UniProtKB/Swiss-Prot annotation:
Location of the protein in the cell: Cell membrane
Name of the protein: UPF0397 protein VVA0348
Pfam family, one: ECF-ribofla_trS
Cystine residue pairs: none
Topology relative to the membrane: Multi-pass membrane protein
Length: 182
């Protein structure tokens, strides 16, 4: 895998923003060891703008950073879950034929964005919950409750914040003021 310097910088910035933004002081505690993080919008934005590889790495590295600084130890199962969320949401550009880059973001695109956010959260954190049950002998009811709360809460948060951000990105791209070579 050969990543360009730009891609590495984007991953570093995204992971830092997602990681620091995911700290408990910026989140809303909702259940045992479960916090709704507004930083999920950062993960979604980087995934949509830069694709599945960047999305995965921003989620994976960023969640690792959160766990390190929060002081509760690194839960690799949930780190992997965040990576999977970023990867799935990162499919958006290819599924929409890069319409966002052309300044287009319609209701169909928004619906796809929300579906990808839901699938990413259910599948990504579903893997985390399953692995917690298998590897750490966590009670199934606890991890299932965490999964349900996180998947629904994150999807709503990503949909609301993401709508306004992606509308703004589309508007900016439509005005052709983005930084591209002539």
């Amino acid at each position: 895998m050969n990543l360009s310097a730009k891609t590495v910088v984007v991953i570093a910035i995204g992971a830092a923003l997602y990681g620091i933004g995911g700290l408990p002081m910026f989140g809303i505690p909702v259940f045992a060891n479960t916090t709704l993080k507004p930083a999920m919008a950062v993960l979604a934005l980087f995934s949509v703008l830069f694709g599945p590889l960047v999305g995965f790495l921003v989620g994976f590295i960023g969640h690792w950073v959160t766990d390190l600084f929060a002081g509760w130890g690194v839960w690799l199962t949930w780190v992997l879950g965040s990576g999977i969320v970023g990867l799935i949401i990162g499919l958006f550009p290819s599924l929409t034929r890069n319409r966002l880059e052309k300044g287009e973001f319609n209701l169909k695109d928004f619906s796809l964005f929300v579906v990808l956010a839901l699938l990413g959260n259910v599948f990504g954190y579903g893997c985390s919950a399953f692995l917690d049950t298998i590897l750490y002998a966590e009670p199934f009811t606890k991890v299932f409750t965490q999964l349900t709360i996180i998947a629904s809460g994150n999807t709503v948060l990503i949909a609301i914040v993401g709508y306004f951000i992606l509308k703004s990105v589309a508007k900016r791209n439509k005005q052709s003021r983005n930084l591209t070579e002539a």
